[in-house]
Amino acid sequence: MAAVQGQGQGKLLYIVVVDDDGATFRYTRSLLHSTLQLMGCKPRHAFEISGRVFDEIRGHMGGDMAMGGGGGVQRYELAADAEAASPRQFQFELYKRRTTLLIPRPLFLRLVCHALALYKYVAPDQRSDLHRACRIRERKESVTILLCGTSGCGKSTLSTLLGSRLGITTVVSTDSIRHMMRSFVEEKQNPLLWASTYHAGECLDPVAVADAKARRKAKKRSGISTTSTIDFDKTRPLNDKPDGKPIGKKQMAIEGYKAQSEMVIDSLDRLITAWEDRKESVVVEGVHLSLNFVMGLMRKHPSIIPFMIYISDEGKHTERFAVRAKYMTLDPTKNKYVKYISNIRTIQEYLCSRADKYLVPKVNNTNVDRSVASIHATVFSCLRRRAAGDQLYDPATNTVAVVNEEYKNQCVANSMSSKGMFKLIQRLGSSRKLMAIVNVDGSVSKAWPVESSSGDGKGGSENGSKKYVGDPIYGPLNIGRAESVNLQFGAFGISAWPTDAGCTSQAGSVNESWDNANEGTGSHVPSSSGSPKKLDGHCKEIKESAAASGSDDDEEEEEEAADVPPNSGSEEDLSEEDIRAIHEEMEGSVDEDCNRSDEEYDDLAMRDCMENGFLTDDGVVHTVFDGNGQKHSTLRKRQVNLRTLSKIDLDSPDTARSSSALPISASSKRNGTRRWKRSLSESFRSRPRSAPSLVELTPKHKGSAVPEVAPDK
């Protein structure tokens, strides 16, 4: 009986958050970790903060954690008809009672904000951001992210990494929709559907295409609005030629791409409708997301946030197709993508021109890590704007100026703080704290007055309406005290802080920073004695852009886009240093260091499982209790396995842990892997901490000392 009691007091697997209206949602530790990562916390910090929240609530399982003016932590009570259920169901209800606690929503938010404050996270409206992330995770709201772009620009890689970063499990490619549609029709019946987008124009009749374009242009001149379609069969006689210019190869490639995209968009429309009804967030990527049709989808689905992915350098774009060939070759006779690279680039030029027309943000995918971070920050900023009542899609102009503005804000913020550090400072002789961007030389680039935090989680904002951050301050400041702080989304998070105009827009604060940030070729750090700038950068662009029509009737623009490539990042206007910086980057590939932070918490989960006695994802308990209810340490064999897997051996260096019995090739490969992969012990020794780790927070019971393991000789 004592063992069962000790085990019941040691386990907390579920936290049921109760709203004022009685609605509930169950959080596990991994789900809370995903929620914190969605709101912009680092993966490692999100893991530790989620564990800290569970440990704090677990310490109050015996009693109630009182909250001023509200309820506290309560145990999960059995249902009234639980005893009448089957014995198996009754045992499960007893298990849930031992492992579940109920907590009101305000107390839950306060505890998480308190843990964020301990890890030095500061934000203008941190509590509202947390509540917004919880609504997405609890499926009270949804977001649909569309990654448009041609073949080989990195959409699939971005969608996978973005889904992992946002905690979105549904990642759909339009190629899978096309593959599903192919199962209902044979290739002979519809060759257009079975063709690839870059050579779909070969399935069209140039005469029929020219005739349809001529009729559409004539009806447009007469003032009749219609959505004409192209006759895709080849039954029209070739000698029946319409009047006008002959259709070129580039224009035929675009027409074939648009024709196949139109066939796929209809099925995607129905899928998005079902996802929005279920409040399910999703990431959709694919070449079939033509921006003309995307604008039509945004009229019906307010949850859509589009992005245009492209590769500016044609040479780097071509090199990415080498991995798709059988023999890793760029020979056009053996690599169909290289064979049709001209059509692929033509489609990209067409999509870039459409993106400029509809103000869809264009992401130059020269670095996957930076692209994922910028898209993540932009998506959450759009969620803030949507919660404030702003519409992402403007039906009057048929543009998404809000999304484009927020993306530019993120890029400008990243360029502003790329060479600075975020610190919470105090001026000499003043007790007021300032959140500042401190340059490498120690000068202050920009600072914001913030309300002093008393350590109870109220440093950001206790409610969503009260303001705790003042207007920015410029000029040299005499720093008396400084401490490092963390921002949500890292360098991109500075865009959420107020500007001179009293809003959170950074679009017009730095001259020409957007061009450098968009191309990834440079950064701009404002001067420490700079003067405030006016917010007029993006407003002028919106006023000058005419109301864009969402149809394909703009023949002159389409033909011009097909013949004259737009300025989508050519190297002619760049300096030699910028060109060198572009070529030195790993364009379109994942840097070996970019995903380390996302994978570090896996090692922490392993260590936490062995030391604290439970897994974070599935709740499996590995702790052994004795007759007195005390927790024993794990076995020696488990400690040896832990040391082997996680390399936690503080008594011997890495060289002593390498086995001399292994072959030379295996040993050298192991040493080579160790040079680029950061071990868990090194991260614990070298990384400075602003809050105690989970191991230090775990209470030490008698008899739980970990046996010492002798190092391998």
Curated annotation (Swiss-Prot):
Residues 231-246, 533-544 have a biased composition (Basic and acidic residues). Residues 218-249, 504-575, 650-713 are annotated as: Disordered. Residues 551-562 have a biased composition (Acidic residues). Gene3D superfamilies: P-loop containing nucleotide triphosphate hydrolases (3.40.50.300). Coiled coil: none annotated. InterPro entries: P-loop_NTPase. Required for the accumulation of phytic acid in seeds. Phytic acid is the primary storage form of phosphorus in cereal grains and other plant seeds. This is P-loop NTPase domain-containing protein LPA1 homolog. It comes from Oryza sativa subsp. japonica. The lineage of its organism: Eukaryota, Viridiplantae, Streptophyta, Embryophyta, Tracheophyta.
